[in-house]
Amino acid sequence: MIKYGTSGFRTHHSVILDISEKIGLALAQLVYYKKESFGIMITASHNHHEDNGVKIMDENGNMVTEDIERYLVQYVNDQFTNDNMPYEPLIKIFNEDIQIIKNKNLKLHIGYDSRQSSPDICEKIIKGILRTNDQFPYIVHPLVTTPELHFIF
């Protein structure tokens, strides 16, 4: 089981790569249900070079709430049952709902640093986002630091 640490998930890059598509799916669904933008920063700053991670931030650039942390942990670890799922499970977001998201200027911001595994993790996150709808709005900010993504976002 992968655990949520300070602001996100960090471990060996291969584990992060394995859960990246689920992270994209989960965050796209959060944008849909919460009607707010989120940021995803791919970095493991001070960790070993083989590690990587994803930091999740709310639309104000702050750490997400504990209920969202729990949701993300349960989502990436496949721990949902009908009794504990906080949102209606979905994979597809309808075009009408995408238009509402776009009209409210909501999107996912994805930033990543210079770690070798970061672009591959980003691509898998995007794959998860686009599984919900191929028109889901997102922006990639390559080669940024975490503070830069906070500022952009």
What are the roles of these predicted feature ranges?
Residues M1-F153:
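Non-catalytic beta/alpha edge segments that cap or flank active sites
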